[in-house]
Curated annotation (Swiss-Prot):
Gene Ontology molecular function: 2-isopropylmalate synthase activity; 4-hydroxy-2-oxovalerate aldolase activity; manganese ion binding
Protein name per UniProt: 4-hydroxy-2-oxovalerate aldolase
Catalysed reaction equations from the record: (S)-4-hydroxy-2-oxopentanoate = acetaldehyde + pyruvate
Binding site for substrate: 12-13, 193, 284
Gene Ontology biological process terms in this record: catabolic process; L-leucine biosynthetic process
């Protein structure tokens, strides 16, 4: 039977949806429950990764170390994963992750800037971790360029390479085409991370698996940036229907999502106007709350901010540019 590994990102991508205000105690309770569902790995921490707690992205409720101290002891079955935006997270964060037993170190850069991650990838490997390259915004460049940057990531030592659709912009056929091309071009496994701004996260994840992806990112109830991510319980049900083993206890996952996560969610992962715009414009989902706040501050429609961010092809870590965009739009009124 074909197998797929699920990385659960409820406690990391979901942090965006809580303005990074998970407490260490909440993370510990959720991590222990998620650990019992059968996921391959659990990723946790600030939404913008280790080192992300800052004025530009939003201060977290706790430090990286405090989250590590809370989560690491309670996870007994799944592996621990962290994500770093090179330049935001440094060697110090990698050493911290290693100290607490993280197995996977994921490096996320704009796909055209994957060379920025070279040092981080090599250091993670030196520390005995499994380095993963996460490449966003592939849907806005030609497939041949996606392949070229994938090969660069492999040459740096990445042992898994992810295609990340951070805006929920891609259509399933685009996802299939890119994953298939990546799979053919390199010798390491391929993963996919989708967002649900056009309600296509499950469809895109399914297309990725059909094209050969072996790793899929999910969150309980899809809890994540923008309109959320691929919901773990829905994706697990789809995989079961397709007779693909993803290791998930479906009933337990559904029950944990309802009992433990729902009470902590500020809102359901519905698709409203601004979230639709994220997917339509190809704007990274983590920009949503920043665009809404900047729009309110300057009297500008957040959709116009999101559209301009998509046009500029900004990526995660540049969220504070929403203020500049909103100010410029306000001056044109």
């Amino acid at each position: 039977m074909k197998k797929v590994k699920i990385f659960d990102l409820t406690l990391r991508d979901g942090s965006h949806a809580k303005s990074h205000q998970f407490t260490p105690e909440q993370m510990a309770v959720l991590a222990e429950q998620i650990d019992s569902t059968g996921v391959a790995a659990i990723e946790f921490g600030h939404g913008n990764g280790l080192g992300g707690s800052a004025l530009q992205y939003g201060f977290a409720a706790a430090t990286d170390r405090e989250y590590m101290e809370a989560v690491a002891p309670v996870v007994k079955n799944a592996d621990l994963s962290i994500i770093i935006l090179p330049g935001v997270g440094t060697r110090h964060e990698l050493h911290l992750a290693k100290e607490f037993g993280a197995k996977y170190a994921r490096m996320c850069t704009q796909i055209t800037e994957v060379d920025i991650a070279e040092q981080h990838i090599k250091m993670a490997k030196q520390l005995g971790m499994i380095p993963i390259a996460v490449l966003p915004c592939a849907g806005i460049i030609p497939v041949k360029d996606t392949v070229r940057y994938t090969q660069m990531a492999e040459s740096y030592g990445a042992e898994v390479i992810y295609l990340l659709d951070g805006g929920g912009y891609q259509l399933p056929e685009q996802t299939y085409e890119r994953i298939a091309a990546m799979k053919k071009a390199v010798d390491v496994p391929i993963g996919f991370h989708g967002h649900n701004n056009l309600q296509l996260a499950v469809a895109n994840s399914k297309a990725a698996v059909e094209a050969g992806a072996e790793y899929i990112d999910c969150c309980l109830k899809g809890f994540g940036a923008g309109a959320g991510n691929c919901p773990t319980e829905i994706f697990a049900a789809v995989m079961d229907r397709m007779e693909i083993d993803c290791g998930i206890d479906l009933y337990k996952t559904m029950d944990i999502a309802e009992q433990y996560l729902r009470p902590l969610m500020p809102r359901a992962m519905e698709v409203d106007n601004d979230r639709i715009m994220l997917g339509y414009a190809g704007c990274y989902s983590s920009f949503l709350l920043f665009a809404q706040r900047a729009g309110a501050r300057y009297g500008v429609d957040p959709r116009d901010i999101i559209k301009e961010i998509g046009r500029r092809q900004c990526t995660e870590g540049q969220e504070d540019i929403c203020i500049d965009v909103a100010y410029a739009l306000a001056q044109k009124k």
